[in-house]
UniProtKB/Swiss-Prot annotation:
<feature type="repeat" description="Pumilio 4">
    <location>
        <begin position="372"/>
        <end position="407"/>
    </location>
</feature>
<dbReference type="GO" id="GO:0030688">
    <property type="term" value="C:preribosome, small subunit precursor"/>
</dbReference>
<keyword id="KW-0539">Nucleus</keyword>
<dbReference type="GO" id="GO:0000480">
    <property type="term" value="P:endonucleolytic cleavage in 5'-ETS of tricistronic rRNA transcript (SSU-rRNA, 5.8S rRNA, LSU-rRNA)"/>
</dbReference>
<feature type="region of interest" description="Disordered">
    <location>
        <begin position="1"/>
        <end position="52"/>
    </location>
</feature>
<feature type="repeat" description="Pumilio 2">
    <location>
        <begin position="154"/>
        <end position="189"/>
    </location>
</feature>
<feature type="compositionally biased region" description="Basic and acidic residues">
    <location>
        <begin position="1"/>
        <end position="36"/>
    </location>
</feature>
<feature type="region of interest" description="Disordered">
    <location>
        <begin position="193"/>
        <end position="213"/>
    </location>
</feature>
<dbReference type="GO" id="GO:0000472">
    <property type="term" value="P:endonucleolytic cleavage to generate mature 5'-end of SSU-rRNA from (SSU-rRNA, 5.8S rRNA, LSU-rRNA)"/>
</dbReference>
<dbReference type="InterPro" id="IPR011989">
    <property type="entry name" value="ARM-like"/>
</dbReference>
<feature type="repeat" description="Pumilio 3">
    <location>
        <begin position="230"/>
        <end position="270"/>
    </location>
</feature>
<dbReference type="Pfam" id="PF22493">
    <property type="entry name" value="PUF_NOP9"/>
</dbReference>
<dbReference type="GO" id="GO:0000447">
    <property type="term" value="P:endonucleolytic cleavage in ITS1 to separate SSU-rRNA from 5.8S rRNA and LSU-rRNA from tricistronic rRNA transcript (SSU-rRNA, 5.8S rRNA, LSU-rRNA)"/>
</dbReference>
<protein>
    <recommendedName>
        <fullName>Nucleolar protein 9</fullName>
    </recommendedName>
</protein>
<dbReference type="GO" id="GO:0000056">
    <property type="term" value="P:ribosomal small subunit export from nucleus"/>
</dbReference>
<comment type="function">
    <text>RNA-binding nucleolar protein required for pre-rRNA processing. Involved in production of 18S rRNA and assembly of small ribosomal subunit.</text>
</comment>
<feature type="repeat" description="Pumilio 6">
    <location>
        <begin position="614"/>
        <end position="653"/>
    </location>
</feature>
């Protein structure tokens, strides 16, 4: 055997061979790392030489266009990693906070104080951790104002890096949003501020002397302004950063005092893909504070103006125009432009001497053909991203500038722009601001295109035209005729074509499931998901029903031409059920009454001719057993008994007929979840026992959803399933307690104990004796007299 093929045996030779292999691998790794460093250094030198040759510095500050963040990973500071024990502790704390299963608020406050004590000095690590950043968000949701201020102080000096971090940016957004209310409370409510200070001291009492030393005395306003000072000088790069752009929008909305919970604001704050970090049982319903405009200090308004001026100073016109079409920077630019145009002190025209965003985008007279402003607007009106900036301009621009843009760009081309899928949204913004004369001219131009718009299922334009005609008191006759011609002359098909659904599909979607066999369980009925065209068609029909005159008459005549089976199917389908609900509403005051139409429609639903429906039970019961149909019954209850509507007074007999139709099917309704809702909303227990009291209640509007319920009890289903729990209110006849009796078998009315016959007789006897002077005033035990019975 050759020597080179001989393999040494033994432990020492094996270890020696492994050491030699490891040395060879280390040498190869060193060589590869040196080559990698050389390649990186050469790339940096190439980039440096490229930037040195390029005189335009704006493009070099536009890193998001290449898919990188504003702050490079190499320049971002490293805060360290949590140890395994720390990660396990914080992970467990996150689970406990998410469950929120604490015996009391004091126990939860004590737990929060302990978590904050463990997290002291590790806040930056937790915020940047993929597994623990959710814990930081939940801590912020439950923190006191003093604890939030401490987080501000811990994050201070690192905000430019945190807002551009993948995980820490969400923590910053939550901290800013949850701290917005504290600014307003410190500004307007000194008493609340003192109360919160006392609560903060109690919450931090566990920290001892250290908590007193670390107490933050600065106002939340100053902490926000200090955060803005850190971000100053980097706004142009943050605008296009993948993560920081969202945080910057949050800051701008908080500084402007805009509502935080409105749908238009929420779309700016976060995307639909954002993970919703919540806490079980925590009340997150929108409050009056979050739905209305907030009071903010003047320093915040000055800060917005400074941000806009710094943004303009750091970017030239070419960069801002590129930003218009940038998917990340466009929403920030929209918000900055809206804040500038809605600020009274900076509301200037496009060719203003003051350098603003609008004057940068539209530097010259747009009415001149071939001007830079005209070229810019014509270039973005068809752009999927840039058209959103044009929507903002047409919505918030001053009247003089709006008229210039309308006459130069839209007036002669409005029909062609309305046909385009993207430009039509800009046209909608334009139509919302047109005068009556301009609106009538626009209708004349668009009317020949109605048939094409209907064929493409773009009914948004048609809906807006009808609504603006009602607002401007313009004639809708010609527009309604064009709509009727576009959908065809057959009234039986108008609603179905408008809702973009065939009769066969509608019947199959709303057909009852087949009965269950002994071997196979009953299949669960799954309704198909409505398409966008069905949704837009339903909205168009609802808008036409709200406009008295030809639009409403067109839909009403089409509904009356339908058989009962089709009306029932429309009532059961999730999208078209809203059309039936809108048709049941009374007509507005000072408009032609729709009483006759509503009476015919309701009669066709509750009293169909024999064989009109395929279901064995009456249509009212079919509606009661459907989640969509229950809304129809609620509309029938409120629209036939509304006390403020004189036209509904004569329809009350129909309401009684519906209640009579529900009575024989009480067991079937009580076995169904939706049936129990209908039985409760219609106060059927009161109808069954005391008809006169039921009539008074429904005529006064004191039905479910309108009455002031004093207490609630939760009832489980007959099988005890906790998932089938239905809330049941204590109504006037004692609904929610067996046989209308309260504790101790005493009847209750409106949440109060009803006096028995013997007690009433005693009162009468005592009053007579007192009047004759033969009886002393002795209060009855356990009885508190009120009103005329007080002695």
């Amino acid at each position: 055997m050759p020597k080179e093929n001989k393999h040494a045996r033994g432990r020492r030779d094996t270890l020696k061979r492994k050491r030699e292999e490891n040395l060879d691998r280390e040498e190869d790794h060193d060589n590869d790392s040196q080559d990698l460093k050389k390649r990186r250094s050469s790339q940096i030198e190439d980039e440096a030489s490229f930037r040195a040759l390029d005189n335009d510095q704006t493009l070099s500050s536009f890193p998001a266009a290449t898919g990188t963040n504003a702050i490079e990973v190499a320049d971002r500071p490293y805060y360290g990693l949590l140890e395994d024990e720390e990660q396990e502790y914080f992970r467990r704390a996150d689970e406990l906070l998410e469950l929120n299963d604490f015996p009391s608020d004091e126990e939860r406050s004590l737990f929060l104080a302990n978590v904050y004590r463990e997290a002291k000095g590790k806040e930056l690590k937790i915020a940047c951790s993929q597994s623990c950043s959710r814990l930081m968000e939940r801590l912020i949701l439950l923190s006191t104002p003093q604890q939030k201020k401490k987080l501000f102080s811990q994050f201070a000096g690192n905000f430019p890096h945190l807002v551009s971090h993948r995980f820490a940016s969400h923590c910053c957004e939550t901290l800013f949003i949850q701290s917005a209310s504290i600014v307003t409370e410190e500004l307007t409510g000194e008493e609340k501020k003192e109360e919160k200070k006392v609560a903060d001291v109690k919450a931090d009492a566990e920290d001892g002397e250290e908590g007193k030393e670390d107490e933050i005395t600065e106002s939340m306003e100053s902490l926000f302004l200090a955060t803005l000072d850190e971000l100053e000088g980097q706004l142009s790069s943050l605008l296009t950063d993948r993560f920081a752009s969202h945080t910057l929008r949050v800051l701008l909305i908080i500084l402007s005092g805009r509502p935080l919970e409105k749908s238009s604001t929420k779309s700016l704050l976060q995307s639909k893909k954002k993970e919703k970090v919540g806490i079980n049982g925590l009340d997150t319903a929108p409050t009056e504070f979050s739905l209305n405009k907030r009071t903010v200090p003047e320093s915040f308004l000055w800060a917005i103006e400074k941000i806009i001026s710094d943004t303009i100073a750091s970017m030239d016109r070419a960069f801002i125009q590129v930003l218009v079409g940038h998917p990340t920077g466009n929403p920030c630019l929209q918000l900055l432009l809206e804040l500038e145009l809605t600020n009274p002190s900076s509301k200037k025209g496009g060719n203003s001497e003051q350098k603003t965003l609008i004057s940068t985008l539209l530097p010259d007279d747009i009415t001149v053909e071939g001007s830079q402003s005209a070229i810019f607007v014509n270039g973005i009106v068809y752009d999927q991203i840039g058209s959103r900036v044009l929507e903002t301009i047409m919505t918030h621009s001053p009247g003089k500038l709006f008229k210039q843009i309308y006459r130069a760009i839209f007036k002669d081309r409005i029909a062609g722009l309305a046909r385009n899928e993207i430009a039509s949204y800009v046209v909608i913004r334009v139509l919302n601001r047109l005068s009556k004369e301009d609106l009538e001219e626009a209708i004349t131009e668009i009317s020949p295109q109605i048939e094409g718009l209907v064929g493409r299922q773009r009914t948004n334009i048609i809906k807006v035209l009808l609504e603006r005609c009602q607002v401007r008191r313009a004639s809708t006759e010609a527009l309604t005729k064009s709509i009727a011609d576009a959908y065809g002359s057959d009234k039986n098909e108008l609603i179905l074509k408008m809702a973009d659904i065939s009769l066969e599909t509608l019947t199959l979607a709303t057909a009852p499931p087949p009965a269950a066999d002994d071997d196979k369980p009953a299949p669960v009925a799954v309704l198909p998901k409505p398409s966008p065209s069905q949704l837009h068609g339903s909205l168009l029909a609802q808008a036409m029903l709200k406009i008295p005159g030809p639009p409403a008459q067109l839909i009403q005549s089409s509904l009356l031409a339908l058989p009962t089976s089709t009306i029932l199917a429309l009532s059961l389908y999730p999208t078209t059920t809203h059309i039936i609900q809108a048709s049941l509403l009374p007509s507005p005051p000072n408009t032609p009454s729709n009483l006759l139409f509503r009476r015919k429609l309701i009669n066709s639903i509750i009293s169909p001719p024999a064989g009109a429906t395929s279901t064995p039970q009456p249509p009212i019961i079919t509606l009661s057993l459907s989640s969509a149909g229950t809304h129809i019954l609620d509309s029938l209850l409120h629209t036939t008994t509304t006390p403020t509507s004189t036209s509904s007074a004569s329809l009350f007999s129909l309401c009684e007929r519906i209640a009579m139709s529900l009575m024989p099917y009480e067991p079937l309704l009580r076995d169904s979840w939706t049936g129990r809702i209908v039985w409760r909303n219609w106060s059927m227990d009161l109808f069954k026992r005391r008809r006169a009291d039921w009539v008074k209640r429904v005529k006064s509007g004191d039905t479910q959803g309108k009455s002031n319920i004093q207490s609630q009890v939760v009832l489980k289903s007959q099988d005890g399933n906790a998932n089938a729990v239905v809330g049941k209110e204590i109504l006037g006849d004692g609904i929610g307690k067996p046989h209308g009796k309260g504790k101790g078998g005493e009847k209750e009315i409106g949440g109060e104990r009803q006096k028995s016959a013997i007690e009433l007789a005693r009162e009468k006897f005592a009053a007579q004796k007192l009047a004759s002077g033969k009886l002393k005033t002795i209060p009855l035990k356990g009885f508190k007299a009120t009103g005329a019975n007080a002695i």
